[in-house]
Each structure stands twice: as structure tokens, then as C-alpha cells.
UniProtKB/Swiss-Prot annotation:
InterPro entries: Beta_hexosaminidase_bac, Glyco_hydro_3_AS, Glyco_hydro_3_N, Glyco_hydro_3_N_sf, Glycoside_hydrolase_SF, NagZ_Beta-hexosaminidase
E.C. no: 3.2.1.52
Protein name per the record: Beta-hexosaminidase
One family name in Pfam for this protein: Glyco_hydro_3
Location of the protein in the cell: Cytoplasm
Enzyme superclass (EC): hydrolase
Pathway: Cell wall biogenesis; peptidoglycan recycling
UniProt-listed PANTHER family: BETA-HEXOSAMINIDASE (PTHR30480:SF13), BETA-HEXOSAMINIDASE-RELATED (PTHR30480)
Active site positions: H174 (proton donor/acceptor), D244 (nucleophile)
Assembly notes: Monomer.
Gene Ontology terms: biological process: carbohydrate metabolic process; cell division; cell wall organization; peptidoglycan biosynthetic process; peptidoglycan turnover; regulation of cell shape; response to antibiotic
Amino acid sequence: MQGSLMLDIGGTWLTAEDRQILRHPEVGGLIIFARNIEHPAQVRELCAAIRAIRPDLLLAVDQEGGRVQRLRQGFVRLPAMRAIADNPNAEELAEHCGWLMATEVQAVGLDLSFAPVLDLDHQRSAVVGSRAFEGDPERAALLAGAFIRGMHAAGMAATGKHFPGHGWAEADSHVAIPEDARSLEEIRRSDLVPFARLAGQLDALMPAHVIYPQVDPQPAGFSRRWLQEILRGELKFDGVIFSDDLSMAGAHVVGDAASRIEAALAAGCDMGLVCNDRASAELALAALQRLKVTPPSRLQRMRGKGYANTDYRQQPRWLEALSALRAAQLID
């Protein structure tokens, strides 16, 4: 049975302390960062070592493209999503990019990348910027839908982020508590559109650590109004809800790590991420042990179903995707 906590490790191999914490059944996933990565073979070995201890863990990474891609040496340098949108055949290129990303990520033993970004580029948020496909909500939904088709064709579940949209809030939730003061109706007409259009295609969503004070005084990731009433109720979304990193400044409004993971799960998150802070991860773990949470079975849907080896580079679709992205001058 998978647990409700996703955490991280400090280096390129498992320490004795890492092995010990991963054995706790409350731990359900592990996310890797650039510090954990040297080259594809090393990542493959790391994933195998993790699965030897806990074969049921979800193994994740942020491999969006552009400036947010942790897997670099030995991997294709993916373009920023905004660069794709600038091409006349953007929909086709987005699908190629989604397939290529998902194939490479799964080939080293990881299950999923937290992608695609569904935020809109309103030219306000530096933390979103070129990570977004577009400022136009319908076109963003179209291109993100193509990216998701590529991911699904490669066997990877898709996670849209950051619900209900981070693009209007100017502050960076990694270091501050952003606010979006617009009304719910304004948000419905713009930032919520990609999430609404793609609710039936997405396997998971990640809410924003942003406060929308006209809707709820809590950040979206701690808000039953956003997660239960709007996402589950109105949009009929039945996939997994991952919290964004509960160590980020935007989550600190709720209290310590134990309070944060408890609040996230109570609001409707299925799994809470606690990264870059082992002491906080241990606090969250202790809270889950006390709460005796039973994670939903839908977490199993997030397991990768694609290549677990390197022969994908001989596949016609790989060569086709590379050729198309090179022709558009999106990759080297």
C-alpha cells in the first residue's frame, strides 16, 4: 500500500538514513532533483536501488522543458513550452515533445514527470514565464492537450499544474505567499479554462501555493473550496491531487510540516510533497503515522507504463520526434 508522503534524498545514491525512511509505509513516493543526477546509467541504478527497498514507490521528477528540467547530461534538452507555441505546427510539436520527454524519463526507471504546466503567461509572473504554453487560455489548453497525448502514448500519466493558475500572481511561491485578487468569475474566464478543458484527460493535478482571497483565505492547495467544490465538484476531476512542495514559503501560512501535510490531505490532496528539508519530512511522516491515513487506490494509476530500457532510441517514433523538433530549431 502506497503512503501519502513524497520526499527526496540528498545525493546520487541512497544513504543508510535514506533507506530507513523509505521503508516506512507512510512514504509513497520520491522525487529526484538535479543534485541526485549524474547521467542516465546512474539514475537507472538509483531507481533500481530504491525499488529494491520499495517496489511500490512512485518515482518522480520535474522535467518540463526549458529552465525546469532536472535530467540534463545524456538527455535531450527540451525547449520551453512557450518556444513550442511560437511555431505554426505547434500542436504537432507539443505532442512530439510530450512523447519524447515521457519516453526518456521512464527509460531510466522513473514513473512520471510533473508536467505539463497549465498556467497562463500573463507577463506578470517571473516564476511562470516561458514555462507556460501561452497567455491565451484556449490555445494553452490545445497545446497542453497535445503534450498530454504524447505523454500518454509513451505510457506516462500527466499532471497539470498549478491549479487554478499561478500566472496572474506576481510573487514566487518558493520564497513568498503570492495572492491573486481577482474574482472567481475572472479566474473562470481565463486561468481556469485549461484545467476545465483538460480535466478528463489529466491523470493528476497539482494546486498552486497561491491565495485567491475573493474565493478562499487559504492557498489553493489547502482549500476545500478549490479542491472539493470546484475541482472535484464542478470540473468532475477524478484523478490524483498532489500537493506542491510543502516546504515552499507559500505553504508556511499553515504552520509546521506536520500541520501542512495534515491540512493538505484534509483539503483533498492525495499525496503531499515535502522536499529539500529532511527534518520537515520526518515531521510530516510522524503526523501521517499518528493520523493513520489510508491513501486512495487512484495513486496506482500514476505508475509508468512505458520503456524501462534504452532501446527506445531505435524506435521510428523517437527518430520522427527528434527530426521534427530539430527542424523547428527547438532542440540541437
